[in-house]
């Protein structure tokens, strides 16, 4: 190890130091100052990540700390994207002005640190430690409200199932090591290319199960809905903005530039992608709670992105487009939802919202329609790019055609629950004697909602030029991904 290697990890070291300082400061200062310090620290991490990517021109892969960390153009960009996601989540929490203990912001910093190191892991050891750091921190965020029975139940379910997925991943890592005598993540790319024995392929499949569990892909999704339902709204925003982005970027890097060529694993992931789209969209149709509806909706969206990730890996810019679009839409949605209390939140409580808070009602409806992917709203472009990529790929028609037909059919389902939300907000009457109290004024959340609206409009006109724009970003970072 040398000082040059530590300089590469400056954003992570700064984030770790900020988390430790915030943990100590919380003992002597008010919790609000710790929340502000955490948000500022995430902003500094974004700047440091940008500076590190622009100044460190890497012509080839650089292995740091004896291979534990992989430093490439892709990992630099992924680290910066995860840092921006953490900054957005911190801003949402800060602007919501939640009266919670200072440890919430500190745990968010540690979870973001785990996500940032996860996308740079070059060794199975660092990958597993980063994954567990993020998972354990997420478990603390879920059960932060200790007086809530639902939160405790959700955290217990998340913890037990996370432990199960960790055991499966560790067993897969042991199989990969036993058959390939290597623990570098690059070994998986050779195995997934079809140049390994059955045991090594099975080990890779078990490792992928751990990543798919983190994404809540069917059939590894049973924890997500109840966990999101019981967690605080700010924690749910963090999961959908930060953790989900990190898991997708990690999966693309594990697959590599050429994608998965091992047909058994490739067709298996395409199958679970179709099931995710089906279960997610149909499951959201039955929900009366907004948290559970969003959980199922995000499970359904994974059915579109996963096939492109495993087919093209890091060579597809559509993955980055989806990550950025997901940020904007989720930040837009939670800029509305964070105005409410964490408990309950049934759709019926939105009745008559347009009378007391017309802007909030409009923002909620339009953001949900964007999340559903209706043309010409922002969410339709990633789905279009993904389906186009599947159709133009080398997948046999007997596999691609049923998948495309299925996701196109279930893509109609979101219109029903989106229109139901619009009906409740604009046409339903509040319960007798309940009324709809005016929401407290949150200037910060309103600014975030307006910014997300403007970004959505701009992105609509620039969506077809995203490849050119992202190539410019790669050029600024001094190379190719």
Curated annotation (Swiss-Prot):
Principal place of residence? membrane
The EC number(s) given in the record are 7.1.1.-
Task: List residues traversing the bilayer.
Answer: 9-29, 39-59, 76-96, 104-124, 158-178, 205-225, 232-252, 265-285, 293-313, 318-338, 359-379, 399-419, 443-463
* Gene Ontology CC annotation, any one: plasma membrane
Task: Tell me the InterPro entries matching this sequence.
Answer: NADH-Q_OxRdtase_suN/2, ND/Mrp_TM
Keywords, in A-Z order: Cell inner membrane, Cell membrane, Membrane, NAD, Quinone, Translocase, Transmembrane, Transmembrane helix, Transport, Ubiquinone
Topology in the lipid bilayer is annotated as: Multi-pass membrane protein
Query: Which top EC class is named for this enzyme in its record?
Result: translocase
Q: Could you mention a single GO BP entry for this protein? A: ATP synthesis coupled electron transport
Q: Which domain of life is it from?
A: Bacteria
Named from the GO MF annotations, one term is: NADH:ubiquinone reductase (non-electrogenic) activity
Q: Per the record, what are the reactions this protein catalyses?
A: a quinone + NADH + 5 H(+)(in) = a quinol + NAD(+) + 4 H(+)(out)
Q: How does it assemble?
A: NDH-1 is composed of 14 different subunits. Subunits NuoA, H, J, K, L, M, N constitute the membrane sector of the complex.
Name the family the entry cites.
Belongs to the complex I subunit 2 family.
| Protein known as | NADH-quinone oxidoreductase subunit N
Native species: Anaplasma marginale (strain Florida)
Gene name?
Answer: nuoN
């Amino acid at each position: 190890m040398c000082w040059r290697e530590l300089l590469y990890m400056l954003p992570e070291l700064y984030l770790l130091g900020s988390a430790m300082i915030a943990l100590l400061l919380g003992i002597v200062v008010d919790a609000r100052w710790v929340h502000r310090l955490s948000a500022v620290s995430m902003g500094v991490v974004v700047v440091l990540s940008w500076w590190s990517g622009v100044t460190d021109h890497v012509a080839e892969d650089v292995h740091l700390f004896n291979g534990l960390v992989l430093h490439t153009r892709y990992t630099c960009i992924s680290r910066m994207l995860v840092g921006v996601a953490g900054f957005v989540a911190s801003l949402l929490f800060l602007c919501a002005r939640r009266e919670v203990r200072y440890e919430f912001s500190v745990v968010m910093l540690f979870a973001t640190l785990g996500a940032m190191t996860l996308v740079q892991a070059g060794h199975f050891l660092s990958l597993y430690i980063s994954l567990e750091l993020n998972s354990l921190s997420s478990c603390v965020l879920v059960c932060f409200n200790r007086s809530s029975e639902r939160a405790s139940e959700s955290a217990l379910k998340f913890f037990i199932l996370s432990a199960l997925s960790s055991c499966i991943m560790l067993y897969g890592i042991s199989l990969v090591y036993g058959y390939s005598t290597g623990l570098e993540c690059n070994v998986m790319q050779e195995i997934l290319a079809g140049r390994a024995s059955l045991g090594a392929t099975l080990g890779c499949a078990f490792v992928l199960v751990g990543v798919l569990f983190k994404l809540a892909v069917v059939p590894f999704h049973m924890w997500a809905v109840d966990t999101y339902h019981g967690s605080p709204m700010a924690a749910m925003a963090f999961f959908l903005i930060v953790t989900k982005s990190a898991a997708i970027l990690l999966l693309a890097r594990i697959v590599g530039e050429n994608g998965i060529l091992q047909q058994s694993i490739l067709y298996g992931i395409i199958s679970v992608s179709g099931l995710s789209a089906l279960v997610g969209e149909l499951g959201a149709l039955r929900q009366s709670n907004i948290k559970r509806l969003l959980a199922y909706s995000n499970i359904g969206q994974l059915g579109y992105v996963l096939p492109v990730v495993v087919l093209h890996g890091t060579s597809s810019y559509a993955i980055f487009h989806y990550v950025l679009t997901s940020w904007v839409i989720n930040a837009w949605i939670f800029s509305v939802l964070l105005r409410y209390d964490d408990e309950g939140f049934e759709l019926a409580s939105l009745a008559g919202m347009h009378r007391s808070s017309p802007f909030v009602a409009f923002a909620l409806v339009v953001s949900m329609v964007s999340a559903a992917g209706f043309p010409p709203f922002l969410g339709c472009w990633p789905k279009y790019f993904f389906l186009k990529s599947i159709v133009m790929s080398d997948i046999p028609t007997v596999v691609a055609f049923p998948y495309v037909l299925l996701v196109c059919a279930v893509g109609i389902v979101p219109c029903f629950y989106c229109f139901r939300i619009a009906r409740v907000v604009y046409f339903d009457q509040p319960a007798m004697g309940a009324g709809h109290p005016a929401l407290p004024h949150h200037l910060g959340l309103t600014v975030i909602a307006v910014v997300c609206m403007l970004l959505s409009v701009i992105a609509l006109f620039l969506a077809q030029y995203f490849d050119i724009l992202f190539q410019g970003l790669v050029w600024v970072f001094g190379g190719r991904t």
